[in-house]
Amino acid sequence: MCGIVGYIGNNEKKQIILNGLKELEYRGYDSAGMAVMQEGELSFFKAVGKLENLANKCTDFESQGYGFAIGHTRWATHGKPTEINAHPHLGQYSCVIHNGIIENYKEIKDKLEKEGVSFLSQTDTEVIVQLFEFYARNLGVFEAWQKTIKELRGAFATLLVTKKDPNHVYFAKNAAPLIIGKNANKEWYFSSGDAPLIGSCDEVMYLEDLSLGYASKDELVVYENDILKSLCFSKLSGDKAYAKKDGFRFFMEKEIYEQSRVMSEVLMGRIQGDEVVFDELNNEDLSQVDEITLCACGTSYHAAMASAYLFERIAKVKAKVEIASEFRYREAIIKKDSLFIVISQSGETADTLEALKIAKEQGAKTFAICNVDNSNIVRLAHLSLLTRAGIEKGVASTKAFATQVLTLWMLAIFMAQKRNLNVSAEIKALLHTPNCVSVKQALHEKIHRLSKRYLDGHGFFFIGRDVFYPLALEGALKLKELSYLHAEGYPAGEMKHGPIALADSKLYTIALMPKHMLYEKTKSNVEELIARDSTVLSISPLEFDLSDDFIKTNEQDHYMCEFFEMMVITQLLAMEISIRLGNDVDMPRNLAKSVTVE
């Protein structure tokens, strides 16, 4: 997840770009860069790390007078966070910035390399500028740009400047946000979000998917699906905090709604035909792995628990799960050459990092599932996969959990493929998951209405079976973190072994009742709680009249699609209860986003 800005006008361009990137820094911050076109000359600057590093690099650079500039702040998805991989990416006479993922970048890169084109970076973005210059050998600039964009598959919002046409900025947008702003001074602005435009623009146009065009001092031309579009601008809101949240009340709410797009990005470039592919694992033989240990803390531990079921069921590999803070002190025995997978959103979780070191010392092959490239955990592990969740501002994890489970599910399928096991049903379900987490307004409104029943009482049970047990644990954790109400997750089959003693009308039970995973067994457990007067909210695609409240989910073909749909419901429920209680959903008390100490 990255942020892009652009500017056409007479003011100091460097500072406008830096100011704009500052407003987008929450989208990504492992590197940043900018390019300025003035009087036909192209200047560019890049820096790794925080935005201030870029500002320091261009301290003496001045850019008054007419021209244009583009800038980018990056959160790595393809390629390490290095200066070479930072945007803008350069051709011989052009440069480009890009937010998104080019799904077919390897295919394009291979084609261009056969034509003698050389690449400097490891990124997917560089193919855009190299492909453009390849076509511009024989075509006009706009025709070359059109042909380039038509060849790209995936999500992208991109800006290009070229010395071949020093009077225009070229842009394109598909499945990633791009906004064009204007003001009375005939200046044009481009941005991934509203925040950089507030105070500089009066009106904005939100580009639709499959849009491309060009802009200069005197004109803006936009095509949508190859049809010339009439320009339609709307008034820009003046609230920057609101803009950063894209109109949502809280970052957590925004991040719940982002999960569909983010999960699409997790899949991009990693499914080819009917197979899961990981470029990062091309040279690795995981077919001989006969034991997996998954180790994590908190929400990541719940993702590990869910994936243990998947590794055993899909890949037929023995899997066990460890809490990192316990593992590091109990003198655990790790089988040499087994696979030791650590999971961490930040890549800096102290207990998980120490557990990784112990496993490595004992001879295990170590594997990191992480959201932050170049973090300590990623650098230390033998292998790694990035979850591509982007920045998560809400302290209570939502999209990071979703992408961890999805990435681990894909890894289980990948390992099953290496063992020549049939995974066709898994691939079909994988491709459907982004739809499963898309939030419908009617659902959110219903959860908001139901939430008022669940504001008091002496506690909550979240219950489920199989992968829905770790989801119950995660649902209970979300509610605890945000509402400060007591909540516990249990395997539904364990109710009779003690917890049912708490059941009465002020014990609230959230029952996860999927059609495709032990429905009748779970239903029987829920009926036992109802018989003892527990107030029950059941979540299922199958009608269940005995519960006090019922949320009907969609009929799915695979239990993991049910898993992700129910995940969203538990997230929204925890958030709505907490909002009714007057709590700060983004910054719950006593908690930090990344736990880097014991």
Curated annotation (Swiss-Prot):
What sequence ranges are listed for the domain Glutamine amidotransferase type-2? Answer: 2-218
Catalytic residues (UniProt): 2 (nucleophile), 593 (for fru-6p isomerization activity)
Function as written in the Swiss-Prot or TrEMBL entry? Catalyzes the first step in hexosamine metabolism, converting fructose-6P into glucosamine-6P using glutamine as a nitrogen source.
Q: Does the keyword Cytoplasm apply?
A: yes
Subunit notes for this chain? Homodimer.
Protein name (database record): Glutamine--fructose-6-phosphate aminotransferase [isomerizing]
Q: What class of enzyme is it?
A: transferase
Keyword terms of this UniProt record = Aminotransferase, Cytoplasm, Glutamine amidotransferase, Repeat, Transferase
Which reactions does this protein catalyse? D-fructose 6-phosphate + L-glutamine = D-glucosamine 6-phosphate + L-glutamate
MF annotations from Gene Ontology: carbohydrate derivative binding; glutamine-fructose-6-phosphate transaminase (isomerizing) activity
* Gene this chain is encoded by: glmS
